[in-house]
Swiss-Prot record:
InterPro entries: P-loop_NTPase, PanK, PRK/URK. It is an enzyme of class 2 (transferase). Keywords: ATP-binding, Coenzyme A biosynthesis, Cytoplasm, Kinase, Nucleotide-binding, Transferase. It is found in: Cytoplasm. HAMAP family: Pantothen_kinase_1. It comes from the Bacteria. Pathway: Cofactor biosynthesis; coenzyme A biosynthesis; CoA from (R)-pantothenate: step 1/5. The gene is coaA. One of its GO terms (biological process) is coenzyme A biosynthetic process. Its main location: cytoplasm. It comes from Mycolicibacterium vanbaalenii (strain DSM 7251 / JCM 13017 / BCRC 16820 / KCTC 9966 / NRRL B-24157 / PYR-1). ATP binds at G97, S98, V99, A100, V101, G102, K103, S104. Belongs to the prokaryotic pantothenate kinase family. It holds the Pfam family PRK. This is Pantothenate kinase.
Length: 312
């Protein structure tokens, strides 16, 4: 564990230091399960789950228990009835980071691990993609070229959804996004019913503003970090893999990319990266990193070897 030379709200760890914090937390995830959770291009293995994600799951488990005790204390102070142990106040986790950095895999692995703890078996995962405006609405607002930027999301709808969850609503509905169609699926909803833990994953979930933001309702947050040059390479590699995979489906919005040569595909991917994803990362996503409870720092091979925990 390394304390920064200047006063700081963070404590830094290398992987060896961090893995020691696992204590006796058991690994209840199999190789087959991990394969299903792993995103395209991700290299996560069971060793990384043991050394990085199990200590993180243990930390979150401890914080869930502490948060519930705090809610009980507040209820006692207000003279309110103790909360139903079968319906605790949901613990909300935000997972942020760039396109292609691996935040979706991080969110899925966390969901799988946390759901195996006895005291919080209901762990739901929602991505903010569902709160993008539909393509027709983005076109009406002249925002198709800004898709993924903060203004392309229904931020009020997202705020209503998370507030409903946090307030103990019986159910809350999130729109569903199709990466195949590159659009919201009309009439389809993801129904979330009083979870113990909700994981909200997306590019801009840690953003702040003059009014109440969704990040203000988080109990814990993770930022998946890497060098910008590495993320660009991962994005291009993923694009090439999808050209022969998802893009080959005639129903895919990006089917026209499936016939590109390697050289053409790299050129197209790099153009998208530099015109959309890189500016969004630098202008909107990266500035939110200091707000995260925990920063996971990846090396060029996708492995997590540095962590920064916010202690305040």
């Amino acid at each position: 564990m390394a304390r920064l030379s200047e006063p700081s709200p963070y404590v830094e760890f290398d992987r060896t230091q961090w893995r020691a914090l696992r204590m006796s937390t058991p690994l209840k995830l199999t190789e087959d399960e991990l394969v299903r959770l792993r995103g395209l291009g991700e290299k996560i293995d069971l060793l990384e789950v043991e050394e990085v994600y199990l200590p993180l799951a243990r930390l979150i488990h401890l914080q869930v228990a502490a948060r519930q005790a705090l809610f009980a204390t507040t209820a006692q102070f207000l003279g309110e009835p103790q909360q139903n142990p079968d319906r605790p106040v949901p613990f909300i986790i935000g997972v942020a980071g760039s396109v292609a950095v691996g935040k979706s895999t991080t969110a899925r692995v966390l969901q799988a691990l946390l759901a195996r703890w006895e005291h919080h078996p209901r762990v739901d995962l929602v991505t903010t993609d569902g709160f993008l405006y539909s393509n027709s609405e983005l076109s009406r607002r002249n925002l198709m070229h800004r898709k993924g930027f903060p203004e392309s999301y229904d931020r009020r709808g997202l705020m209503r959804f998370v507030t409903a969850i946090k307030s103990g609503a019986d159910a809350a509905c999130a729109p569903v996004y199709s990466h195949l169609l590159y659009d919201i699926v009309a009439g389809e909803k993801q129904i979330i019913e009083h979870p113990d833990i909700l994981i909200l994953e997306g590019l801009n979930v840690l953003q702040t503003g003059p009014a109440l933001m969704v990040s203000d309702l988080f109990d814990f947050s993770v930022y998946v970090d890497a060098r910008i040059e590495d993320i660009e390479n991962w994005y291009i590699s993923r694009f090439l893999s999808m050209r022969a995979g998802a893009f080959a489906d005639p129903a895919s919005h990006f089917h026209h990319y499936s016939t590109l040569t390697d050289e053409q595909a790299v050129f197209a991917a790099r153009d998208i990266w530099h015109s959309i994803n890189r500016p969004n990362l630098i202008e909107n996503i990266l500035p939110t990193r200091p707000r995260a409870t925990l920063v996971l720092r990846k090396d060029s091979d996708h492995s997590i070897n540095r962590l920064r925990l916010r202690k305040l």
